[in-house]
Amino acid sequence: MRVAIYHSSDEHSIQVGKDLAKILSQNEIVIDNEKPTVVITIGGDGTLLSAVQKYLNLLEEVRFVGVHTGHLGFYTDWREYELETLVKALKSDGGAEVSYPLLNIDVTHTDGSHISYKAVNESTLRKLSGTMVADVLIGDNLFERFRGDGLCISTPTGSTAYNRSVGGAIVHPRLEVLQMAEIASINNRVFRTVGASLIMAPNETITIRPVPSFHRTYNFTADRIDLLDKHVKEVHYSIDEQKVKFLKYRHTGFWNRVRNSFIGSIDEV
């Protein structure tokens, strides 16, 4: 086992990273930030998302585990005072894992160039100013012409993030699906959209094709990647063949995560 430590930039997380490195060394576990088999993130969910982006080329070999140093994270299963217990669990690791779908994103520009991204949670496309007008294709078929602030495409694990904030459904990650949620769509007697989030089968794809206009600067996001782009021709979304893998021995069940994150404790009647 080779372990990488990926921490947030705040002083507390940096210190927790140093403490963890010391405990790992004491237990003769190799620290390797270049070619790890386990990546331990220290911080919050944002830190874990950044770590996935850093190790995209190693997703087949790497499993992730999160230590949260602030508020309870959706992806982080351990607290900073449990480092000794975490290392003991690593030493007895049997290779068990739980995997979640990844979003594959292909951006085509007006000059014909392509850029690909992957996301654990979601991707959004919004117009920087004014109403975004875009054709939405499901597969090769035109589904609707959208007018509004933008669109959010999420994975099942990402369904609890921004997707939930814009009224999308929460989806269990064992369902390897895409979800498209509208961001402030325009619906009246002249302009209509479906007005609800759409959940796609694993083999279906979504393409957003903005209608050309004078003001065509778009805000594109993929997890923590946030870009302004003036040359977007279309954005194509699908479920990626790869998955992101997490250590299983302390991995909280999905619906327990949802309850802990959004509801909290419940007094039984």
From Swiss-Prot:
Biological processes per GO annotation: NAD metabolic process; NADP biosynthetic process
Q: Which HAMAP family match?
A: NAD_kinase
**EC numbers for this chain:** 2.7.1.23
So what family is this one in?
Answer: Belongs to the NAD kinase family.
Give the species this sequence originates from: Pediococcus pentosaceus (strain ATCC 25745 / CCUG 21536 / LMG 10740 / 183-1w)
Subcellular locations according to the entry? Cytoplasm
Active-site residues, as the UniProt record annotates them? 45
Where it mainly occurs, coarsely classed, is cytoplasm
Which lineage ranks, top first, belong to the organism behind this chain?
A: Bacteria, Bacillati, Bacillota, Bacilli, Lactobacillales
Q: Which keywords label this protein? A: ATP-binding, Cytoplasm, Kinase, NAD, NADP, Nucleotide-binding, Transferase
Q: Which reaction does it catalyse?
A: NAD(+) + ATP = ADP + NADP(+) + H(+)
Residues binding NAD(+) are: 45-46, 121-122, 147, 149, 160-165, 184
Signal peptide position in this chain? none
Q: Which GO terms describe its cellular component?
A: cytoplasm
Q: What class of enzyme is it?
A: transferase
What protein name is recorded for this chain? NAD kinase
